[in-house]
């Protein structure tokens, strides 16, 4: 192994503790890397440091060693519950890795306790562990650390415990912000004492990182470490011992090329990057069947509890394949990774550099290969200019085995594979539409038929992006995909139960629709009923003359009674009035009868 060195550890202006030097020898690091030689002396002189360095340059030791040295030089030794240092990192995997590196040193210093706080674990157990064992050095993800500061019910007062804090480290600061942890970090900073040393480490310096530097660091010393032998104006952002390749092939050829490559490199260790969690699930399952004799594991951001175990297991492997999303792209140090294969280019250019940086770490050699569609070829020049990352062409292999029919037969035999393929295709198209380099990765230029063949789809899914499009080059299978069963008998039983329920609901709904239809058919009858009622009403109105006369008589009688009560008329006049009203009514009726008799 060849190291990019900046002198031995003994050459530091501030001497290191003998046991720290012993731990470094055990780890096999006799020399410093440039970022270590630049930042460690500053940290140990109580300076705040904002360091930018290429991925794989040894940033972890650049803050682990100063933390130990600063805590060892404390006048008052830390009590069990006092926190002397906090390391915040964006992902669980990176936190586990840092905790592991730290443990190589703390085993020589039993006076220091360390604790790991990450998601995917029971927070109540974390609280109990801290109360029992303490945690002078905390390695944590932002969400879990913020949660711990807010917990009061379990008897943990972390705000009091951090009053003794000497060092805060924000590792992969740019990704902390990219992942939306700014609010959590600001909350955490409010709990921490102002008199502390702060280190901010990042692979890139953005405006957001600059804002965090201003908010969290006091008069920081800025360190920017470039690769040796490269002019500052054209400093490449990937390790100098990394060999970067690209391969241009059609969407329906890409999977065959990937499998061919992996079958010919079985004795090596690979990371295979996909753009979405659904793609990892689908292609990971396919690779398990098609690439025999090698350990294949899958990891992505939606795995809550398995991720930690899978990550630790893969790190220990001598050879194997880890199918993953960008959850593995930053800061993760997996020993002896030979190839980083980017089946899908990442959603932004900086992520390309971080993916490549999972190999060729700390002086090791390594290679990276990105698969590109013909319409994406201009991405090569873009990376060379924008990311200072030149790539060499690797030609596609001729006469590779066509494995897509095998993948189709897997989907026909197991509904789980069929559904995973459909979800993977949909998620890929949606991710493609959101690509930051949308002048190169244009959804409208995508050959959906070729892409669907590359996913070995049995039919095209229904999705907004495909609405109104025709695909004469894609031939769906002549099978009703609703009849494809799950191999898992329990899942298939549940599916059949659900289908039966849906059939019943459909029948009921059809009955309701039929009733509505019948109602429309009887409109004529309803119309007749309405007409009949209107005629009856009219007849009542036309035949109400006698009723009106009776009403008039009643009103006259009422008026006469009121006049009598008020003394306006006498009783004789009242009786005379009543008689007059009655005679008028009788006369009217009699006249009617006489007329009728005369007519007869």
Swiss-Prot record:
- Its EC top class is hydrolase
The protein's matches in InterPro entries, at most eight in alphabetical order, are given as:
DEAD/DEAH_box_helicase_dom, Helicase_ATP-bd, Helicase_C-like, P-loop_NTPase, RNA-helicase_DEAD-box_CS, RNA_helicase_DEAD_Q_motif, SPB4-like_CTE
Bias kind Basic residues: ranges: 514-537
Q: Where is the composition biased (Basic and acidic residues)?
A: 500-513
Short motif (DEAD box): ranges: 171-174
Helicase ATP-binding domain mapped to chain residues = 40-223
Q: At which positions is motif Q motif?
A: 9-37
Q: Which GO terms describe its cellular component?
A: cytosol; membrane; nucleolus; nucleoplasm
Q: Which residues carry this modification: Phosphoserine?
A: 544, 594
Q: List the disulfide bonds.
A: none
Main subcellular localisation: nucleus
Its EC number is 3.6.4.13
Spell out the subunit comment.
Answer: Interacts with 28S rRNA. Interacts with double-stranded RNA substrates in vitro; the interaction stimulates ATPase activity.
The record comments on the domains as follows:
The Q motif is unique to and characteristic of the DEAD box family of RNA helicases and controls ATP binding and hydrolysis.
What family does the Swiss-Prot or TrEMBL record give for this protein?
Answer: Belongs to the DEAD box helicase family. DDX55/SPB4 subfamily.
Q: What is this protein called?
A: ATP-dependent RNA helicase DDX55
Gene name in the database record: DDX55
